[in-house]
């Protein structure tokens, strides 16, 4: 058994779980950390896809009561029907663009320097958004209409650029379009479920020949680590947004992006790409 490989799996699982639902880009962090750990070959890339399932299930577990009510009330309650329709509307823009451009995006942007630039730009956008007057039109996720959902879905398209952050794009987009912090954050969590399930299973299907039973242990460790750390991150973020804005994440993104650029151009770290 390769204990160092298991350690890599544990580290990446924790990174995925902690960053997936924070506005700091899990994809960007996984690209950078995988590069540092020299786990960026084809198997490593499939691994980073598989461990996303742990993070998705963490959200499903945290909101299991609400999701169960939605499933059982579809067709009989208007609020459940509207909730599902809003998720579908918000899901479609990024899904369509992703299918059209994902190969090009992975070829040119899944590298440390483009990710670092996206970190910085995303951080600046968060600071700008936080300094705008915030007019709240929607206090609860249940009060959203299809127009709010479509706007958040269009904002999510920015997250196709690695380093941008899916949660960052949807949460800040939600704030920009009149959602309260709690509503924007929760809708981002719910929207992650169809988006990440679709992206994960699509990538797994495309790379099914790379998966082997010999890798089950490292994949399992990464999956469990992702689930536990994501559950903690989701609960922590909900408490955080009730009392703070997102500026701290913006400064983290900017600082981290600058460090990556400095290490890349100074030769301190031999990043790939």
From Swiss-Prot:
Pfam families: BacA. Disulfide bonds: none annotated. Coiled coil: none annotated. It catalyses: di-trans,octa-cis-undecaprenyl diphosphate + H2O = di-trans,octa-cis-undecaprenyl phosphate + phosphate + H(+). GO terms for molecular function: undecaprenyl-diphosphatase activity. It is found in: Cell inner membrane. Keywords: Antibiotic resistance, Cell inner membrane, Cell membrane, Cell shape, Cell wall biogenesis/degradation, Hydrolase, Membrane, Peptidoglycan synthesis, Transmembrane, Transmembrane helix. The chain crosses the membrane at residues 4-24, 43-63, 83-103, 109-129, 184-204, 218-238, 248-268. Bacitracin is thought to be involved in the inhibition of peptidoglycan synthesis by sequestering undecaprenyl diphosphate, thereby reducing the pool of lipid carrier available. Belongs to the UppP family. Catalyzes the dephosphorylation of undecaprenyl diphosphate (UPP). Confers resistance to bacitracin. This is Undecaprenyl-diphosphatase. It comes from Nitrosospira multiformis (strain ATCC 25196 / NCIMB 11849 / C 71). The lineage of its organism: Bacteria, Pseudomonadati, Pseudomonadota, Betaproteobacteria, Nitrosomonadales. The gene is uppP.
């Amino acid at each position: 058994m390769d204990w160092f490989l298991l350690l890599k799996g544990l580290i990446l699982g924790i990174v995925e779980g902690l960053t997936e639902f924070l506005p700091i880009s899990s994809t960007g962090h996984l690209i950078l950390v995988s590069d540092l750990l020299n786990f960026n070959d084809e198997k490593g890339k499939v691994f980073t896809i598989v461990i996303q399932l742990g993070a998705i299930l963490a959200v499903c577990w945290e909101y299991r009561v609400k999701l169960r009510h939605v499933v059982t009330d579809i067709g009989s309650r208007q609020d459940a029907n509207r909730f599902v329709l809003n998720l579908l509307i918000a899901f479609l823009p990024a899904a369509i663009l992703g299918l059209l451009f994902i190969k090009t995006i992975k070829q040119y942007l899944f590298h440390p320097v483009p990710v670092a630039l996206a970190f910085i730009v995303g951080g600046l956008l968060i600071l700008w958004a936080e300094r705008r007057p915030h007019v709240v039109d929607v206090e609860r996720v249940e009060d959203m209409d299809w127009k709010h959902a479509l706007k958040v879905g269009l904002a999510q398209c920015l997250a196709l650029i690695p380093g941008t952050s899916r949660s960052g794009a949807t949460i800040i987009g939600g704030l920009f379009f009149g959602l309260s912090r709690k509503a924007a954050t929760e809708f981002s969590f719910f929207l992650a479920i169809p988006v990440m399930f679709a992206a994960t299973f699509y990538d797994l299907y495309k790379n099914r020949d790379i998966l082997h039973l010999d890798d089950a242990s490292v994949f399992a460790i990464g999956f469990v680590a992702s689930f536990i750390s994501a559950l903690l991150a989701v609960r922590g973020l909900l408490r955080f947004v009730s009392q703070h804005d997102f500026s701290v994440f913006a400064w983290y993104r900017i600082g981290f992006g600058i460090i990556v650029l400095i290490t890349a151009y100074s030769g301190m770290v031999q990043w790939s790409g």
